[in-house]
């Protein structure tokens, strides 16, 4: 069965794995999923990114982060914003602040995929892919 929204699939896999307290999760690799994973890693939501396999069977192995004695997940929620059927674009001034700056919005811009903070610093807008907090 074909996956029509690989970004939603990636977010769902990460969300499910973190709720079940898994150490790692596998995600089908693509340039977009790698870019999103790098943003999540730079913002401190995931620990590591490794690649496995070759060609169309290539997968990303994402190491998830937890905090405290009871291993509560760092990622509390992930929400897809722009979907294949309804794209959401924002200019620099319209970029959202997630939980008053505690979370991030991942934005696809002409300069690449980045967090909302980086997009504001660079003065670019783009497609709002998802919210993470």
From Swiss-Prot:
<dbReference type="Pfam" id="PF00410">
    <property type="entry name" value="Ribosomal_S8"/>
</dbReference>
<dbReference type="GO" id="GO:0005840">
    <property type="term" value="C:ribosome"/>
</dbReference>
<dbReference type="InterPro" id="IPR047863">
    <property type="entry name" value="Ribosomal_uS8_CS"/>
</dbReference>
<comment type="similarity">
    <text>Belongs to the universal ribosomal protein uS8 family.</text>
</comment>
<keyword id="KW-0689">Ribosomal protein</keyword>
<comment type="subunit">
    <text>Part of the 30S ribosomal subunit. Contacts proteins S5 and S12.</text>
</comment>
<protein>
    <recommendedName>
        <fullName>Small ribosomal subunit protein uS8</fullName>
    </recommendedName>
</protein>
<dbReference type="GO" id="GO:0003735">
    <property type="term" value="F:structural constituent of ribosome"/>
</dbReference>
<feature type="compositionally biased region" description="Basic and acidic residues">
    <location>
        <begin position="16"/>
        <end position="26"/>
    </location>
</feature>
<dbReference type="GO" id="GO:1990904">
    <property type="term" value="C:ribonucleoprotein complex"/>
</dbReference>
<comment type="function">
    <text>One of the primary rRNA binding proteins, it binds directly to 16S rRNA central domain where it helps coordinate assembly of the platform of the 30S subunit.</text>
</comment>
<keyword id="KW-0699">rRNA-binding</keyword>
<dbReference type="InterPro" id="IPR000630">
    <property type="entry name" value="Ribosomal_uS8"/>
</dbReference>
<feature type="region of interest" description="Disordered">
    <location>
        <begin position="1"/>
        <end position="28"/>
    </location>
</feature>
<keyword id="KW-0694">RNA-binding</keyword>
<dbReference type="GO" id="GO:0006412">
    <property type="term" value="P:translation"/>
</dbReference>
<dbReference type="GO" id="GO:0019843">
    <property type="term" value="F:rRNA binding"/>
</dbReference>
<keyword id="KW-0687">Ribonucleoprotein</keyword>
<dbReference type="InterPro" id="IPR035987">
    <property type="entry name" value="Ribosomal_uS8_sf"/>
</dbReference>
């Amino acid at each position: 069965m074909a996956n029509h929204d690989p970004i939603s699939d990636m977010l769902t896999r990460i969300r499910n794995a973190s709720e079940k307290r898994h150490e790692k999760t596998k995600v089908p690799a693509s340039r977009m999923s790698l870019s999103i994973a790098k943003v999540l890693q730079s913002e401190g939501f995931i620990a590591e990114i490794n690649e496995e396999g070759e060609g169309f069977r290539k997968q990303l192995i994402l190491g998830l982060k937890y905090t405290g004695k009871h291993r509560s997940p760092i990622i509390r929620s992930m929400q897809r914003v722009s979907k294949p059927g309804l794209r959401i674009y924002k200019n620099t001034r319209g970029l959202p602040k997630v939980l008053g700056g505690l979370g991030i919005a991942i934005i696809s811009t002409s300069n690449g995929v980045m967090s909302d903070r980086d997009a504001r610093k660079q003065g670019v807008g783009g497609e709002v892919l998802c919210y993470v907090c």
